[in-house]
Amino acid sequence: MSSGTNKIVESIKSEAQEKADKIIQDAQAEIATINSDAEKTAEAEKNKILDNGKKQSDMKYQQIISEAKMNARRAELGAKEEVIEAAFAKATEDLKAKASSDDAEYSESLIKMIEEATEELGGGDLIVQVKESDVAKVEGHLKKLSADLATKTGVSTTLVLGEPIDAIGGAILKTRNGDIEVNNTIESRLDRFKGLLRSEVANVLFKN
């Protein structure tokens, strides 16, 4: 190979080497950039995952705490309800015992319940129903009650005993034709006032 040819070949090889070096250099720079970007992306993703994980963990924690509080509240309300129901059951038993005796206070209350029911009906010809053991407590009062209630209501009033009823105590009054009735038994009164009484009983039982 001539000297001129060698120079050309060497020049081509040198130029090719420079291009190769440049390509390699550029490639290495690109790889470094890719690696750097990948690391940043990976770090961001890692932080995102950790952040999401923390959020999910916090949410789960709050959910568990909320459920625990709700269950505790439910259990507390359930326990209070049991205590209140037990208090009502005890009160009912006490009333039953009082109404089954010759207790003067109950006899007075029974007459009062008949008066209230008569006034609610507006007087008139009414049938009075009480339990069998209470018949003797009221039959001697009906004539005077009729006169007193006629004055109160402004309507001619006659109270007569009807068939005995099955009740703890109290009375049921109704018109002669049975169209209108006022249930003033102890059971009915307890049911009517239970909502109000429940609140008062709860305040007394759980005031602390």
UniProtKB/Swiss-Prot annotation:
Name of this protein: A-type ATP synthase subunit E
GO annotation, cellular component aspect: plasma membrane; proton-transporting two-sector ATPase complex, catalytic domain
Role, per record: Component of the A-type ATP synthase that produces ATP from ADP in the presence of a proton gradient across the membrane.
Organism: Methanobrevibacter smithii (strain ATCC 35061 / DSM 861 / OCM 144 / PS)
Source organism phylogeny: Archaea, Methanobacteriati, Methanobacteriota, Methanomada group, Methanobacteria
Major subcellular location class: membrane
Bilayer disposition of the protein: Peripheral membrane protein
GO biological process entries: proton motive force-driven plasma membrane ATP synthesis
Database matches in InterPro entries: ATPase_E_C, ATPase_V1_Esu
UniProt-recorded Gene Ontology molecular function terms: ATP binding; proton-transporting ATP synthase activity, rotational mechanism; proton-transporting ATPase activity, rotational mechanism
Region (Disordered): 37-57
